[in-house]
């Protein structure tokens, strides 16, 4: 029979067992953190009707989407988790309690060009809060505070959540008489980190059609820097010239004040007028998060406030605020930079039992007792030589191997080897269990990420 050469498609990540354990550990920290803030887990279909996903219109989304026909059905793979959320809330409105707080960790699909650190299938980790008619400004401060707690729990320390408000930007552009061009301006400014200030200015004049004076005024505005207080004080100098600007500045002052109340240190968040977010549906506070020691990575977490996202599915006003972590990309770049903690265990089991007798009943009973005590235990039942069994234990990376032969069974003892130190003991079950649990608690110390 002819065989097919196994391969993984370009742009799709497939991990070996050890890094998969690291990825799972990251996801578990996210789930634990989000649950601590009262978010409920949600899962939505990977496949939706194309008209649902593309309700807003085509453009770049339609170029990147995986779309196919199945019989008469026009179907597409989801390209993010936000649009399915909008559909979900509109569909199940009568069964939900508002504000509706959900988190979702799931795969999304985009048919863009595969390149280093960019994937066509990747995990996103989203949190969103959806209101019914209104949504208090406090939520716009709580969302980035959750990201601070999440990244800190992962082990990151040198990161910065950059905060802005779209109303400030729209109000400022209105002052310049550029209301109609505001969307194009924000999409251009959003490229600042990628193409630099000179190219942004050129794009503003050549592509957007601004005058040199208008482009210079915008570049001066987005270049306002300093401490959060200094930036907010500088913005206060523009007050009174446009109502939308004043509203945005009031919201930004409130968000920064509440961020401090939520316990986010000022070194971890900054008012940054270059943050615009290219997506049109953002209407208020916007966020981007970067790793200070690795600016080349770009934003690893972004989001913001939106007021009309569900308008394509319902007449109800369902404002929301949310943020998304590109989990696959973050995991990839952390691995590339050597920032994933190699000391944390990645073995699928804590104990591997190697029976030394033909009758496996005692080994099965021992495995059952260890599992009942909460110890992840694997029973090796293959009839192979001792060396092959130990090679298997080494390859798995299990911290403890238990041998159970006639002598141990007769004496009511357990022979246990610490695979790190090489020390081997022969103790009662209770003493062996105590030794294993103490050793595991020491091994599980530390964060997933090596503190940068």
PLM features: residue spans?
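Phosphate/dinucleotide-binding and metal-coordinating scaffold of catalytic cores
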Residues: 97
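Positively charged, Gly/Ser-enriched RNA/tRNA-binding surfaces
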Residues: 19-37, 48-51, 72, 84-94, ...
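Glycine-rich, mobile lid/loop segments that gate access to catalytic sites or pores
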Residues: 161-172
């Amino acid at each position: 029979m002819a065989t097919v050469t196994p391969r993984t498609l370009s742009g799709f990540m497939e991990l070996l067992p050890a890094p998969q354990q690291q990825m799972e550990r990251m996801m578990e920290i996210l789930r634990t953190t989000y649950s601590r803030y009262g978010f409920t887990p949600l899962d939505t279909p990977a496949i939706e009707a194309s008209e649902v996903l593309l309700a807003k219109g085509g453009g770049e989304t339609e170029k990147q989407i995986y779309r196919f026909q199945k019989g008469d059905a026009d179907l597409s793979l989801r390209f993010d988790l936000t649009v399915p959320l909008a559909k979900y809330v509109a569909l199940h409105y009568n069964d939900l309690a508002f504000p509706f707080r959900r988190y979702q960790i799931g795969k999304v699909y985009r048919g863009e060009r595969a390149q280093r650190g960019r994937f066509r299938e990747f995990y996103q980790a989203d949190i969103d809060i959806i209101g019914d008619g209104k949504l208090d400004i406090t939520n716009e401060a709580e969302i980035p505070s959750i990201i601070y707690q999440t990244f800190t729990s992962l082990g990151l320390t040198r990161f910065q959540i950059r905060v802005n408000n779209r109303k400030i930007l729209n109000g400022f552009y209105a002052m310049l008489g550029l209301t109609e061009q505001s969307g194009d301006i924000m999409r251009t400014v959003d490229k600042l980190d990628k193409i630099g200030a000179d190219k942004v200015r050129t794009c503003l004049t050549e592509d957007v059609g601004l005058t040199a004076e208008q482009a210079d005024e915008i570049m001066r505005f987005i270049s306002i820097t300093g401490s959060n207080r200094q930036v907010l004080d500088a913005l206060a100098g523009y007050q009174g010239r446009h109502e939308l600007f004043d509203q945005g500045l009031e919201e930004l002052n409130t968000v920064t004040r509440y961020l401090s109340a939520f316990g986010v240190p000022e070194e971890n968040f900054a008012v940054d007028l270059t943050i615009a977010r290219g997506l049109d549906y953002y209407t208020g506070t916007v966020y981007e998060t970067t790793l200070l020691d690795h600016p080349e990575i770009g934003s690893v977490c972004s989001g913001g406030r939106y007021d009309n996202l569900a308008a394509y599915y319902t007449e109800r006003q369902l404002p929301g605020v949310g943020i998304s972590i590109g989990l696959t990309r973050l995991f990839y770049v952390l691995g590339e930079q050597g920032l994933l903690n190699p000391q944390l265990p990645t073995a699928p089991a804590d104990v591997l039992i190697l029976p030394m007798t033909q009758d496996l009943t005692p080994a099965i009973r021992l495995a059952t007792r260890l599992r009942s005590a909460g110890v992840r235990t694997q029973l090796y039942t293959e009839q192979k030589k001792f060396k092959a069994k130990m090679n298997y234990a080494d390859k798995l990376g299990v911290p403890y191997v238990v041998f159970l032969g006639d002598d141990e069974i007769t004496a009511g003892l357990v022979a246990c080897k610490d695979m790190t130190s090489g020390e081997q003991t022969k103790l009662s079950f209770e003493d062996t269990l105590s030794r294993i649990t103490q050793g595991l608690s020491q091994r599980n110390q530390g964060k997933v990420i090596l503190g940068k």
